[in-house]
Every structure is written in C-alpha cells, then in structure tokens.
Amino acid sequence: MNIDIIISADDIKEEKIKDKSIVVIDILRATSVIITALNNGCKEVVPVVEIEEALEKVKNNRKNYILGGERKALKIEGFDCSNSPLEYKSELVKGKTLVITTSNGTRAIKEALLAKDILIGALINGKAVAEKLISLKNDVVIINAGTYGEFSIDDFICSGYIIDCIAKDMEVKLSDISKVAKYLYNMNTNMEFIKEAKHFKRIMELGLFMDLEYCCKKDIVSIVPQYKNGIIK
C-alpha cells in the first residue's frame, strides 16, 4: 500500500487523488462533528461549501433537517448548531439529515470527488479508519483540510496516527511527507503537540475547552462514514 498526504484543501489535485482511497481529516472540528452526529443516530450528512446552498437544501422540509457549521470557528446565524461535536446529541440528530458547511472540512470533502473511496476520519475513529483502509486494498491519500489553505499540525498528527495503525498491520510505502507525519505522531503519542496548532489556540481562545478535549481523544467511535453521491453515511 502506498500512502501519501495532501496538507490542505487548496492543494488537492486530480492526479493525486484519482482512483485512490481518500480519507478527509479535519479534527478541529468538521470531521469530528460528522462522525459524532452519525454515531448518535443522524440519518445522513450532506456537506456543502456555501451557506446559501445549505439554506436552499432545507427550505422546503425544515423539520427533517439540522443545519450545522461555522465561519471563522463561530456558529452561523440562523443555524441550529455550531461546529461543536458536543452539540450533536442523539435527541437532536436522531433520524434527521444534517446539512453542514464549514470553512475547511466540507470544502476538502467536495474537492475529493475523483477518488475511488472517500472516508471521513479523525482521531476519534482513527483506528477504525485504518482498518477500513486495509480492507479496501488500495493506495491511500490522506487529505488534511488544513486551516484556510495553510498546514495544520492537528490534522497532520492525526494522519500520522492513522498511518501508524496501518503500518502495524501491513507493509506500507510512505511518501516523504507521510514518513514525517508518522514520525511526528510517534514523538507525540500523548497529543500534547497538537496544543501548538494555530487552530487549536483559536478554539481555546473561544473557551471551547471541552470540544478540544473531545476531538483529541483516540478511538472512542468505531464507525467510518463514507461520502457517496453527495451524502455521507
């Protein structure tokens, strides 16, 4: 298995992802939200890029939808939820469709359409993602959503964790950047270095300490959502 990493949504190129098995990672916080909502009984998740598109999706059947997302890490006016995974409790999301738009994560998902498989990953389901990738028997590209086109330490360390899980079970051929991600994770298995991430500090400034604690937990969820035909299940 060949494994490569793309460091932000801005760096996604057709030739890198075509026919590959892709994992999109945005641990702070879009993919953590998506995984959590589905784990708590959400029927499906529809990722969109623009706020207007999200509003259009729900306008004719509002009661069956949850609107979630953020801009600049803050809740969007008129939406039901922000980008906090802790808001997506079972009593709110069960049986409903979540339409979500975020600054980085949903754009990364929508840019990956030429991939063979598109999985949704985070630290909270990292080992399960690794096991799914092994079962797919295909070359892998891990897409880090990044932060406004820039490299993110948090997504990169999560990539390293998933790579480390795969490498323990099978032979892998890593690109240089994948080797660095695995090395960085192995040097920081307690997740302390994530606290140096710019976006981590931004969320900390907003007082969302419980979000950060939750998103930095490993393997508390066993599902691996997959994006197909515009829907994540």
Curated annotation (Swiss-Prot):
Keywords in alphabetical order: Hydrolase, Magnesium
Enzyme's top EC category: hydrolase
MF (Gene Ontology): 2-phosphosulfolactate phosphatase activity; magnesium ion binding; sulfopyruvate decarboxylase activity
Keyword Mitochondrion among UniProt keywords: no
Entry's EC annotation: 3.1.3.71
Catalyzed reaction equations: (2R)-O-phospho-3-sulfolactate + H2O = (2R)-3-sulfolactate + phosphate
Cofactor: Mg(2+)
HAMAP family noted in UniProt: ComB
Family the entry assigns: Belongs to the ComB family.
Listed name of the protein: Probable 2-phosphosulfolactate phosphatase
Organism: Clostridium tetani (strain Massachusetts / E88)
Gene responsible for this protein: comB
